[in-house]
Structure formats: structure tokens, C-alpha cells
Amino acid sequence: MCSRVRWTLRWESELQLDDHVELASFFRKTYGPTGAFNAKPFEGSRSWAGARPELRAIAYDSNGVAAHMGLLRRFIKVGEVDLLVAELGLYGVRPDLEGLGISHSLRVMYPVLQQLRVPFGFGAVRHALQKHVERFGRHVPANVLSGIRVRSTLPDARLDLPPTRIEDVLVVVFPVELAMSDWPTATFIDRNGPEL
């Protein structure tokens, strides 16, 4: 199904309650097929799962929200080095538009990374998405790193779970203000907060 989409950039404080309700519904429908647990954070009007983004790239078409990518500037610890990054995450595309692709949202978001003058864009994805993320390089400078464990805090403190989790994921780095050679060599990254 081909759909004409219109991308908008929205700062978090610009979103109204109706926007959050529409985005929450979008995420439930997008993440629900991957498991009910994945859709659970988006109950009601909550349009974020872990850390709340500060900026969102949202694609709309005649059926509403078509795709989404969030951005949050934060300091992460790469090995022993504190590093400012713009974390990209909370990505979704409506199931009927799977061909829209994450690369479209990256083409919208990369100029924003340049305007924000962050050293790097940063993201983490499951190993199952390796071939998918390796295609990023066609449109934006992206480096996919493996063999790195990432620690995140849980979004909520719970009595039945430890406060942090460590995942073996693929780390995606987008050089912006610095070269990739400036990215610290390490096998462990600490988000010092929940994932986006």
C-alpha cells in the first residue's frame, strides 16, 4: 500500500493531549503485534515507553500517524568516557506502511542532529535488525557496532525487578560534530537512565 506522508518535527512541550492520545494508539497498534507486553507502556494517553523524548519526527498521512522517531539529548558513559549524544529511539511505522522504512525518518532527523550540534547520534537495536540498520548508510553516515553491552535503568522502580537491565544489542552511531574515530572504544555503555 502506497501512502503519501508528511513529516513534522514537534518539540515535546508543543504536543497537546490529543497528540499524545493519537500517538499512544499508534504505538499500541504498532508494537502490539510483537507482543502484548510491548504495547503495555502505551496505555491511555502515554506516548512514550521509557525516557520521554524531547523532540519527535512524526509522519502523518490521510489515516493519521504513519511513523515516528524520538530524540533525547543525554550524557551516556561509553567505557569510562562521559559523552553527549542525541539518542534516537521510540521508532515505529504503521504496519500497513512497513516499506516506509526507518531510513526516511533518519533523513528527516539527521539535519536536526546537525542543527543541535551534538557530537553523535546514538541508538541501540536488537541483533535481528542488523541487516535493516546496515542499510542506514545509504542515506546518513551510520556505524553499526556489535559486542557492546548497554545498561539502562527501568522506567519505573519496581519491587519485583532489579533497577537496571543489561542488554547485548547492536549500537548504531551517527557521527555529527565529531568523527567516528572520536567515538571511545568500549564494550560497555551506561545510559544512566531508561532507554528512549
Curated annotation (Swiss-Prot):
Subcellular location, record wording: Cytoplasm
Name of the gene this protein is made from: nodA
Annotated GO CC locations: cytosol
Main location: cytoplasm
Species assigned in the record: Sinorhizobium terangae
Family: Belongs to the NodA family.
Coiled coil: none
PROSITE patterns per UniProt: NODA
Pfam families: NodA (PF02474)
Alphabetical UniProt keywords: Acyltransferase, Cytoplasm, Nodulation, Transferase
Function field: N-acyltransferase required for nodulation. Acts in the production of a small, heat-stable compound (Nod) that stimulates mitosis in various plant protoplasts.
InterPro entries cross-referenced by the UniProt entry: NodA, Nodulation_prot_NodA_CS
KW Acyltransferase (keyword) present: yes
Gene3D superfamilies associated with the record: 3.40.630.30
EC number of the protein: 2.3.1.-
An example Gene Ontology molecular-function term: acyltransferase activity
Keyword presence, Transferase: yes
Protein's name according to its UniProt entry: Nodulation protein A
EC class name: transferase
